[in-house]
């Protein structure tokens, strides 16, 4: 019931943002970025994603604004290809907002898990923490502003890193510790502020 409650709350609170348009950095990093224009074809996606990991200039149409954020750029390209696969325009903003809302929901679930790991005897604290995170007005930027996905996706991996570390303290399995490092690495490949 906790997962369903948090997912439902996210949808109810943020569904109204689906038709919000692109703005600010969305123009150079998404709308005019030819590197994101991938068809829903596995070969083309593979080549595109490979280029995001080897060429920071793929971050923007303006090579001077290049940043090394391959997982973020991959998520934008995936959005473009998924929009096409669903019969939408590749740059239909609704597809981008659906992914941002999904990332926000996952972050709420991770906050819940993290709180439950901190206070294992008080399970309701996790639900409350997750709901507060999901509903907090400051969370509107990463949901409404597509380019701010860098913040929410980096937060996803950061929260996952912290939760896995706490989980590793109790289960003492080496693979949980290694999963911490993988999550941290994914965060760094999304945005360097994950450090």
PLM region spans:
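Polytopic membrane enzymes that build or remodel cell-surface glycoconjugates and lipids
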Residues: 1-195
